[in-house]
Each structure stands twice: as C-alpha cells, then as structure tokens.
Amino acid sequence: MKNKAGFVALIGKPNAGKSTLLNTLLNAHLALVSHKANATRKLMKCIVPFKDKEGYESQIIFLDTPGLHHQEKLLNQCMLSQALKAMGDAELCVFLASVHDDLKGYEEFLSLCQKPHILALSKIDMATHKQVLQKLQEYQQYNSQFLALVPLSAKKSQNLNALLECISKHLIPSAWLFEKDLMSDEKMRDIYKEIIRESLFDFLSDEIPYESDVVIDKFIEEERIDKVYARIIVEKESQKKIVIGKNGVNIKRIGTSARLKMQEVGEKKVFLNLQVIAQKSWSKEEKSLQKLGYTHQRNRD
C-alpha cells in the first residue's frame, strides 16, 4: 500500500470557516464553531484520511489555527503566535478566504508565510455564480504565489474532495504518523473544554465570550460516563452575574447545551458541573495566560 502523510496549516481571517470545514471533513464536532469572530484560540490537530487518484492513502494532519488578525491585547497576540507557529511547523498551508472577504487578508498571509500553499475560496454557497467567478478572477493576479485555487463550500460539502486531492498531490510519500482511526490527538478533556467555550459563544452576547475562558479542574473518565468539573472564568463580577443569569437560567442553558454535545462526541453519558468565577484582568496578564496554556513569541531585535 502506498502511503503519504503530512502537516497542513489551515490559515484564514476570523470567520473564514476553518473550523466548519474541519468538522465537515471529519464528519464530527471537534473544532469550535461560532458565528462570532475569533472563537478559536488554540491550535488543534485534526486527522483526515484520504485516498487520492494516484492510489495513495494519505493521512492529512490539519492544524486548525486562530483567525489571522493583529490586535494589541495580549490574549490576541498569543492567538496570532499559534497561527504563526502552525505555519512554521507545517509542510503545506491552506489559506481559507471567504468569498465575501477583500484581498487584504490574503496579502497579509503572503507577507507572513514562506511555505507552499493552496488558496481555498470558502462559502461559495452564500454568493451568486457571478460573484464567485469575479472573486476567483481577482485572486488570479496572485497565481504565481499559490499552488492551486479551489472554490468550496463546507456547509454544502461542495468541492471538498478537490481540496483534499490537491493537498495529497503535494505531500511526500511517508508512513502514517498516527493510528488509522484517530481523528485528533487532542485529549477528551481538551475537546470538552472547547465544547463548553462554544456554548458560551452560543448563549452569551457582547464581549463576555471574549473575556471568558474555561478550566477543567477535574475529569473522571469511566466506562459508561465521563464526569467533568469545570470553571468558567470571567473578568468582572457583573459578567459573572450575566453568565449565571436570573435564577441560574443562563448557566443551565450553557451546561445543558455543552453536555449534550459532549455526549455526542464522547458517545457516552456526561455529568457536567459548572462553576463561574471572576478573575480580574486575566486576559491581560501574562502569568494568568500562561497558567491557562496561552503563550506568545516576543519580537527579537
């Protein structure tokens, strides 16, 4: 059997549809999806097997990254570092651009990325045929920069095989790096954490989801049930009250939604205990961010 394997960084502006694309390719709910921008904060490996036209069995290890953006906030700098690290670690990059985006995001990507890359135009189901053709034509001015230009829709599963075929074509023959049926090397507790964060984005408005994080203090994995004890961290007491809601209505909704998603992913019952605490300025202090697993690379003179 002929095998290929390789790491592919999935890069794009916030809300380009990176996590939706990966969940569709995996046919599973692993990556955090939200209509709000900048929901993804940390790097996640997602493993997609694919048999290409040349008969190679390819193991494509996608590196799902936070949206490519620049902000002064320390947390956002940590997120940008994750994307830059993924580009450095990968053999190949895929830049995902929404059909509604201008070209500035791609131009920024070109200034940062030294690796060969594929340009994928996402959300084509949300535009007319004329609009898609016009956007493809606009990107053609950069045709010397990318390996291929692939229009697709993750939501409608359009042209996804074309993307995988193109990726596989540019991977080198190699033994597989992970077990055959593995979808991610993430621990279940980390996947559960992201599911709780996703529920925060689903049920809370304004800045609260961006000024919150989740810590799983205790995780007990049993044969028939997983027991999860987690804290939702916010920055202000006023935010804590909103997360809990009157008579606990908000935290109940968040908890129920998260638990049902956990049970679907883990394929077993889940007991979920959620607490809410206020920790002033946690997203602005480097020590607090390090404790939560966020790091960033400082510029060197």
Curated annotation (Swiss-Prot):
Gene3D superfamilies associated with the record: 3.30.300.20, P-loop containing nucleotide triphosphate hydrolases
Region entry G4, spans: 122-125
Domain Era-type G: 4-173
Localization in the cell: Cytoplasm; Cell inner membrane
Region (G5): 152-154
Membrane topology classification: Peripheral membrane protein
Keyword Ribonucleoprotein: no
Keyword vocabulary terms for this entry: Cell inner membrane, Cell membrane, Cytoplasm, GTP-binding, Membrane, Nucleotide-binding, Ribosome biogenesis, RNA-binding, rRNA-binding
GO MF terms, alphabetically ordered: GTP binding; GTPase activity; ribosomal small subunit binding; small ribosomal subunit rRNA binding
Record region (G2): 38-42
Annotated spans, G3: 64-67
Main localization (coarse): cytoplasm
Residues annotated as binding GTP: 12-19, 64-68, 122-125
BP-aspect Gene Ontology terms: ribosomal small subunit assembly
Domain KH type-2 residues, every copy: 204-280
Family (UniProt): Belongs to the TRAFAC class TrmE-Era-EngA-EngB-Septin-like GTPase superfamily. Era GTPase family.
Xref: HAMAP family: GTPase_Era (MF_00367)
NCBIfam families assigned: era, PRK00089.1, small_GTP
Oligomeric form and interacting partners: Monomer.
Function per UniProt: An essential GTPase that binds both GDP and GTP, with rapid nucleotide exchange. Plays a role in 16S rRNA processing and 30S ribosomal subunit biogenesis and possibly also in cell cycle regulation and energy metabolism.
Name of the protein this chain belongs to: GTPase Era
Protein's organism: Helicobacter pylori (strain HPAG1)
Species classification: Bacteria, Pseudomonadati, Campylobacterota, Epsilonproteobacteria, Campylobacterales
Gene, per the UniProt record: era
